[in-house]
Curated annotation (Swiss-Prot):
It holds the Pfam family ANP. Disulfide bonds join C94-C110. InterPro entries: Natr_peptide. Belongs to the natriuretic peptide family. Residues 1-27 form the signal peptide. Residues 28-83, 130-148 form a propeptide. Residues 54-83, 105-127 are annotated as: Disordered. Expressed by the venom gland. Natriuretic peptide that dose-dependently induces the rapid relaxation of rat aortic strips phenylephrine-precontracted. Acts by stimulating cGMP production in a dose-dependent manner (by probably activating NPR1 and/or NPR2). May also show potent hypotensive effects. Keywords: Disulfide bond, Hypotensive agent, Secreted, Signal, Toxin, Vasoactive, Vasodilator. This is Natriuretic peptide BF131. GO terms for cellular component: extracellular region. Its main location: secreted.
Amino acid sequence: MVGPSRLAGGGLLLLLLLALLPLALDGKPAPPPQALPKDPAAASAAERIMRALLPDSKSSRPATDRMVHPEHQAGGGDTRRLQEPAKKGLLISCFDRRIDRISHTSDMGCRHRKDPPRAPPAAPSAAPLAVTWLIRDLRADSKQSRAA
């Protein structure tokens, strides 16, 4: 058995609810809710509003368009000129071929890319060579003059 101290802590309330439960279930079911009297003017206004809010109704499309795209109502004009131009033919792969022409090349990857041939080194002109000899001779003369 359960001691009286355990029942005082909240078990007593549970026992009381369990004892009263059969009495509550013997009652009659709740009556159905009464329908509100309909006003024909209010009903037709509500129906018009609901018809206007349906997405499939043609009468709601102009109102929706004005809400979604307000710039067109204020003389927005054609928006195509604001879009970026198409970038046809600008896609170049890593080996300087158009992307739709990749299958027609023999080297299919970037690591096989060949750099353009370099120009052969130009022959040095006579002027820098003469200046180099002159500087070398001047240094040799200055070393000899210091040694003397």
